[in-house]
Amino acid sequence: MDLILYLEAHQPRRLRGIPPLKLGEADDLLDVELDRSLFEKVAERCYRPLLKLVEASENGLKLALKVSGTLLEQMEAWGSDLLESLKSLVSAGRVELVAGPYYHSIASLIAPEELVEQTRMHVDLIDELMGVRPKVFSNPFLIYDDRVGQLVSEELGMSVVIAEGSPRVLGWRAPSYVYKSPASETRLLLRDYRLSDEVSFGLGRGYVRADSYATRVSRIEGQVVVVGLPAETFGEFIPAEAGAFEFLKWLPRELSKYPWVRFSTPSEAASKYEPVDELAVSQPVSWLEGKDLSALTGSPLQVAALEILRELRVKALSSGLARAWRLLSQADLLYSMRASMGVFLKFERAACSLRSSIAARSLTSKA
């Protein structure tokens, strides 16, 4: 059986409290000093020790890693050593890079063509920086439905998707098998939410040990187990002193006691096993609360933000302000609005600035 450790690495670009009335460039919306400060903190606590641990591991540790386009930008600007470490691990086959919307955005909730375009942008940037073109797709928070699977296959030519193993969709079936989308040839690798949540919520409290966790994994029947987490779980959400990296350090050794279990990348696992069944996902799933989109679309503020994004998208793209709009489409912003009026107000001010800039450029083009 194959064990895939899938990590999403992302640092959102934070919006300024009061953006300029009109944008000279898209990044005028951003609090760059805050972005750099937070990036450097997380890089020191999480990204550097994580990559060093993978490099030093002698028991076959591999990662499936999605690094958002905006985080890759920050690494280029403020942490080039991280790019070098990552490139080395990719070249050695220790890390498989996964592609998705460049801005870690909710593009799939807005327009199919936006999801396709942002993913192509992400693939191109990874190719430029790492010399590889990812063949595996995942959405932020593992958002997925049949429509996404069809787009990934037909428009992007990618054959593997990592998605949430929602009990609502699986029914009596287990997430520990390769499935196939009914709308395409896309192979689905499904996150095991129980094993994933055990690390997220149990590791920092001392409830999870590498030896007992390895034993649990070894007893699962199936083809593949996907444990999916934010990369920042290790070192940022769960500090090093609470055992975050010790768990990862010792897990490969403990798993080596069970020769039928091995670390794999998504491409390796998907090519090794034939799908056991088709899995129809008519309504979106995610790894968020409720295993659906309610954590992104359930509040009036979130509904209002989505309406604003839909209203401005075509106008922004045709006015040369695509990046500004795409920065506002970051999934983190929408997720945070469910409990924060302050986040929505920053978003609304930025949207007003974008709207004014669109109008100004329209007048200039007509003059």
What is each model feature region?
Residues 112-141, 215-228:
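CE4/NodB-like, metal-dependent polysaccharide N-deacetylase domain
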Residues 106, 166-170, 189-207:
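Positively charged, amphipathic and often flexible ligand-engagement surfaces
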Residues 10-12, 69-73, 102-105, 142-145, ...:
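Short, solvent-exposed loop/turn segments at secondary-structure junctions
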Residues 153-171:
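His/Asp/Glu-enriched short active-site or ligand-binding loop at hydrolase and phosphoryl-transfer sites
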Residues 2-7, 13-111, 135-138, 159-164, ...:
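Short, well-structured secondary-structure segments
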Residues 49-50, 77-90, 169-181, 208-217:
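Alpha-helical scaffolding within the catalytic cores
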